[in-house]
A protein has these predicted regions:
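Hydrophobic core of transmembrane alpha-helices in multi-pass small-molecule transporters
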Residues: 15, 83, 96-120, 231-232
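Symmetry-related core transmembrane helices of the 12-TM Major Facilitator Superfamily/SLC fold
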Residues: 172-191
């Protein structure tokens, strides 16, 4: 990779971006079972998909028209991290008497602001690479790989770390871990290269912001078949 300076900075961003997710995504169910919310596991995971329907578009409009993407990335991670830490603190205080509505509300706020950051982090990376004259097609994939590395490292940390004989993967400490990493990335995001915002005549329509124009691709038989089998495999 050319220009190692920006590459390393974006590697760190991607590592932290997915480490946040890896801290609880595979282990949250075990904690919910331990506190008597095993029947609600599906609802917790479904919320990630629900907020992903509209939050990325809303945050994307803000980043596209009003505030630089790296700043929006930092703000979103700040809110998501604080909400996740609050969820962990509530789990600590409540012990085995966790109220579903309270924990779920805090968790939902966190994922509502986390899910848009996946696309935002890609936008920040593309902008940074282009600013330094690099090829996004060739130079971004090796950077993105470290997102997967971050996810795995965070997951393993939670799986093997324990306090008083209780593994993080079985307790609220996984939320603390995710939240702290989120706050670190929130601060780090503000140090990343500035991303341009759209000029007055370049604003996107609502259809473009929500990605609705992509459905036109399904007019092509090959794309429709690919999409159907992708859903079956996913």
């Amino acid at each position: 990779m050319k220009n190692n300076g920006i590459s390393i900075r974006l590697i760190i961003m991607n590592f932290l971006q997915y480490a946040i997710w890896g801290a609880y995504l595979t282990s949250m169910g075990s904690y919910l079972v331990n506190i008597g919310l095993g029947a609600k596991i599906g609802i917790f995971y479904a919320m990630q998909g629900i907020v992903s329907i509209f939050m990325p578009a809303i945050i994307g409009i803000i980043a596209d028209k009003y505030i630089q993407a790296q700043k929006v990335l930092g703000l979103c991670h700040g809110i998501a991290g604080l909400a996740m830490i609050a969820a962990g603190y509530y789990g600590l205080v409540a012990g085995d008497s966790v109220n579903f509505a309270t924990l779920f509300s805090l968790y939902s706020i966190s994922v509502a602001f986390y899910m848009p950051t996946i696309a935002l982090s890609n936008s920040v990376a593309y902008s940074g690479l282009e600013k330094f004259g690099m090829d996004t097609v060739k130079d971004f994939p090796p950077i993105r790989v470290f997102g997967t590395v971050g996810f795995i490292c965070s997951m393993l940390f939670v799986n093997f770390m324990s306090i008083d004989g209780v593994q993080f993967q079985l307790s609220y400490n996984q939320f603390f871990t995710s939240g702290v990493i989120g706050l670190v990335l929130a601060a780090y995001a503000f140090t990343l290269p500035a991303c341009p915002v759209a000029k007055g005549g370049e604003s996107k329509s609502v259809a473009e912001a929500f990605g609705l124009k992509a459905f036109a691709l399904f007019k092509k038989k090959d794309m429709a078949i690919f999409f159907i089998f992708s859903m079956l495999l996913g």
